[in-house]
Amino acid sequence: MTQLEYALSGIVTKEMKIVAEYEGVDEEFILEGVKKGEIVIPSNINHKNLIPKGIGRGLSTKVNANIGTSDAYPEIEKEIEKLNVAVKAGADAVMDLSTGGDINQSCRKILENSPVPVGTVPMYQAAVESISKYGSIVAMPEEFIFEVIEEQAKDGVDFITVHCGLTFESLKKLKDNGRVMDIVSRGGSFTIAWMLHNNKENPLYKHFDRLLDIAKKYDITLSLGDGLRPGCLEDATDAAQIQELIILGELVKKSREAGVQVMVEGPGHVPIDQIEANVKLQKQLCHNAPFYVLGPIVTDIAPGYDHITSAIGGAIAAASGADFLCYVTPAEHLGLPDKEDVKEGVIAAKIAAHAADIAKGVKGAKEKDLTMARARKALNWDEQIKLSIDPDKAFKYRVNKNISTAKTCSMCGKFCAMKIVSEYLGTSTMTC
């Protein structure tokens, strides 16, 4: 049985109990959320070392880190290093997006070493292997994508991105209305190329019931991908994007009816003034399924700083109701991220998630900031560093920018605002 089927039967699973304890909520709250499909717990029955996390309404906003090999950098060991960095920095999930080297081995190694849920985009492996087996991506037999999905499911993958909403109907909207950047999703581009070359409907849509059978067998959470997500601000919230979203909403209902957990992916590049509307629209069209967003990136002019542009968008999206943020690293649009990029991306996304949780009233979020404020008032440097979202960086700044015995910071010194005011108010502080 899947987590959803257990919930529908009124059974609180071990995974639900772990999520409830982590979130500080009642088990019944998690049970009801999973039952309604508003909370998912990605947890493949074969991922043995998994510490499950819940994603969805009423829970803390979660962060995903993308890792994986490329044709230029096929070394699996480096991706394991990135995995460890991501988890240490606070990633709640990782996705293996490998396209280089031994993709099967990469996924298995990441699963062996990951305590957090692991996701994939099976079309990546199917496309890469189709080139060697059949000569091209478009020569791939329909059967092959399902063979890859089944193989990854057996290995223990917890959630998979599947671009099931890319149909001839949604493609027509793209052709009729035009775009600056057409399609920027790799999985989406592979799928569209296959469809147009073979003049056949997307097999993941056409044979969605078969996909559901595999997902149900292993309790894989489907992450319905946005193959028509906008790749620049100019393309945001257009007819093609919305048409795909409508189709995904229909597939959400089918997934739930089959007892399969499901969430929905979203944009992309979106102007700040359109982010809230995008989230509200997804929640309405997709029946309050958990919403997993890439960023969104709020300006196209900041390569090298897209961890910042995405954190801005992510905070707004999550505050508006998005549940799961996919990080963006400083290397986005420029190259494969290294482990430092991974850390920067996770931290930026965690800041966005936490800021949104304060706005949403997530249990315990605001209290963290109050605890930090009290530590600052008390000049408790050790506590401030401990409470920081990146304690290592906070410690380095404290040590490198100040004399080791100083009670002051080098910014204010004897002109500390808190010290001066506390002397006249009679409140207890030493210096800032």
Curated annotation (Swiss-Prot):
Full protein name: Phosphomethylpyrimidine synthase
Enzyme class at the top of the EC tree: lyase
Gene Ontology process terms (BP): thiamine biosynthetic process; thiamine diphosphate biosynthetic process
Binding site for substrate: N66, M95, Y124, H163, S185, R186, G187, D226, G227, L228, R229, E265, Y292
Gene3D superfamilies with a match to the protein in the record: 6.10.250.620, Radical SAM ThiC family, central domain (3.20.20.540)
Gene Ontology molecular functions: 4 iron, 4 sulfur cluster binding; carbon-carbon lyase activity; zinc ion binding
PANTHER family: PHOSPHOMETHYLPYRIMIDINE SYNTHASE, CHLOROPLASTIC, THIAMINE BIOSYNTHESIS PROTEIN THIC
Cofactor remark from the record: Binds 1 [4Fe-4S] cluster per subunit. The cluster is coordinated with 3 cysteines and an exchangeable S-adenosyl-L-methionine.
